[in-house]
Curated annotation (Swiss-Prot):
Gene designation: guaAB
EC number: 6.3.5.2
Coiled-coil parts of chain: none
Catalytic activity field: XMP + L-glutamine + ATP + H2O = GMP + L-glutamate + AMP + diphosphate + 2 H(+)
Pathway participation: Purine metabolism; GMP biosynthesis; GMP from XMP (L-Gln route): step 1/1
Organism lineage: Archaea, Thermoproteota, Thermoprotei, Sulfolobales, Sulfolobaceae
Protein name per its UniProtKB record: GMP synthase [glutamine-hydrolyzing] subunit B
GO cellular component: cytosol
The entry's keywords: ATP-binding, GMP biosynthesis, Ligase, Nucleotide-binding, Purine biosynthesis
Binding site for ATP: S29, G30, G31, V32, D33, S34, T35
Length: 370
């Protein structure tokens, strides 16, 4: 049965009115899920809802101001600057899961303070079905999944969590966003993880990697925005890698294995494995066969070289673009090489050694690297 946004709003309105009997903070990340949850709640509950966006330092360029301006006709969004607190607390951390957990702790500690400042009792957030399915399956910690994990938010942070979209999938959230009058730039927006660029600085977090990635993200999004892809973004990781003779012989082209690890999914559980880089450019179906062979080892992401940059560089930029119906499974996008080369040519930071393209499906990779 197809999703009916009007029916959903009619059903959720009395539930929200009954549950939320005091002031509520609506946490907005700028992604479609949290923004839709906030606008929906604000429409139903009015001034009881205070929409806030925490600038964690892991947002894209000018993101907080852009989102605030886009939403000004729908709700008043307050931006709270916590950049230094978040970056200094996470700097130097390498493990993907530890980074996500630390981010979650910081995020909810900050929200707890905001809830108290506004004398609120509730936190409205944009958890959707895919989030809690993944987290309960142990694939990765989605920072906004608390109730499903059995975390007592009232005891831990002093607020009750309200999740009006928890039974919806991404395509249904987009339909609801459109129905609620959100700008096209929001409902067609790229999914953006709660921890933002933190989980796209793969491996050790440094300020240098973060700032390079922020600039590169603008370049990648600008060039891929018209291709009708489900999700597309850039990652940065250390270029240190070793040539692997055994794997190279098996797939018939040069393979190197990076020292940086990335998250994947084997069966229904999280796997932490290597990133493999291949040097041969073939048609996408041949590349798919290579990817399938390589991921039968402890490899969770396979990337193919687009262009060498500065030989003295120490970072690799990975471009990831996928198509998917439900974000539970995904296929890599078959982007024209000329477009990928154009992007690589526009990426000019001297610390960048190479630009690569990710050719891994989900599974065995997760869409994000961490």
């Amino acid at each position: 049965m197809s999703f009916d946004p009007q029916k959903f709003v009619d059903e959720i309105s009395p539930q929200l009115k009954e549950i939320v009997d005091g002031r509520a903070i609506a946490a907005v990340s700028g992604g479609v899920d949290s923004t839709t949850a906030a606008v929906l709640s604000y429409k139903i509950l009015g001034d009881k809802v205070i929409p806030v966006m925490i600038d964690t330092g892991f947002l894209r360029e000018n993101e907080a101001e852009n989102v605030k301006n886009m939403l000004k006709d729908l709700m008043p969004l307050q931006v709270i600057d916590e950049r230094e607190k978040f970056i200094s607390s996470l700097e130097g951390m390498s493990d993907a899961e530890e980074k996500r957990k630390k981010f979650r702790q910081l995020f909810y500690d900050t929200l707890s303070r905001i809830v108290k400042e506004f004398n609120a009792k509730y936190l409205i957030q944009g958890t959707i079905a895919a989030d809690w399915v993944e987290t309960q399956g142990g694939i990765k910690t989605q920072h906004n999944v608390l109730v499903q994990l059995g975390i007592d938010t009232e005891k831990e942070w002093g607020f009750k969590v309200v999740e009006p979209l928890a039974d919806l999938y991404k395509d249904e959230v987009r339909a609801l966003a459109k129905y609620l009058g959100l700008p096209r730039d929001i409902y067609n927006r790229q999914p953006f993880p709660g921890p933002g660029l933190l989980v796209r600085v793969v491996g050790k977090l440094t300020r240098e990697k973060l700032e390079i990635l922020r600039k590169v993200t603008t370049t990648v999004e600008k060039n891929l925005s018209e291709l009708n892809l489900s999700q597309y973004f850039a990652v940065i990781f250390d270029s240190a890698a070793e040539y692997n003779k055994e794997l190279s012989n098996e797939v018939g082209c040069d393979v190197k294995v990076y020292k940086t690890l990335a998250t994947g999914v084997k069966g229904d559980v999280r796997a932490y494995g290597n990133i493999a880089g291949i040097e041969c450019r073939k048609d996408y179906e041949s590349l798919r066969e290579i990817m399938e062979k390589l991921t039968s080892y402890n490899i969770t992401h396979v990337v193919v070289k687009i262009k060498d940059k500065n030989p003295e560089g120490i970072y690799t930029i990975g471009i990831r673009a996928v198509n998917t119906q439900d974000f539970m499974t995904a296929d890599f996008a078959k982007i024209n090489w000329n477009i990928l080369e154009k992007i690589a040519n526009e990426i000019n930071d001297k610390k960048i050694k190479e630009v690569v393209y990710d050719i891994t499906t989900k599974p065995p990779a997760t869409i994000e690297y961490e």
